[in-house]
Amino acid sequence: RWRTLIEQMLSRGGPRLYQKPAVTREGRVHHRELMCRIFDGNEEVSSAEYMPMVLQFGLSEEYDRLLISRLIPLLRYWPEENLAIQVTAESLIRPRFQRWLRDTLMQCEKSQRRRIIIELAEADVGQHISRLQPVIRLVNALGVRVAVNQAGLTLVSTSWIKELNVELLKLHPG
C-alpha cells in the first residue's frame, strides 16, 4: 500500500505543499516552512508518517529532487519570503545528488539562493556529520542557509554545532 501510494505521488509531481510561518519571539516571520502531505484516498497524511517509507524504499533522492525543484519557482511568487524545506541526509550525502543540487542552485540568482533554508533533522546530522560537512560547505558557499530541527529530541553529541555552519536551531518541544 505505502509503496504504491508513494510511487504514485512521485509520478504526479510530488506531495501537496503547505506553508507555515516560523515566527521569532518578536513576532516577525523569519521564514515560511514548506510542509508536505500526501493524499491516500481518504485523508491527507503528514510527512512524519510517510517519510520513513520513502527512506525504506530508497526513494529519498527522487523525493528531495522533486521538493527542491518545486521550491525554486515559489521564490519568484514570494519575493520577500525565506522558504525552508526539509531535505533528507540520505540524499545530501550522495555525490550524485550533491552534483544535481549544485547545478540546480547555480541556475538560481544569488538573491534567490539566499532565501532558501535547507532543514535537517538533528539525529541525521549527528549520524552523518562527516559526510554532510562537504555538502553543507557547498550550499553555504552558494548562499543557501542551513537549519537543524528537532534539536534535543535524541541524545546526540552537540559537537556538530561548531563543525557545521548552521544558521538556525529549531528545538524539539519535548
Question: Which positions does each model-derived feature cover?
Answer:
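Catalytic core of bacterial c-di-GMP phosphodiesterases, primarily the EAL and HD-GYP domains
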Residues: 29-33, 59-131
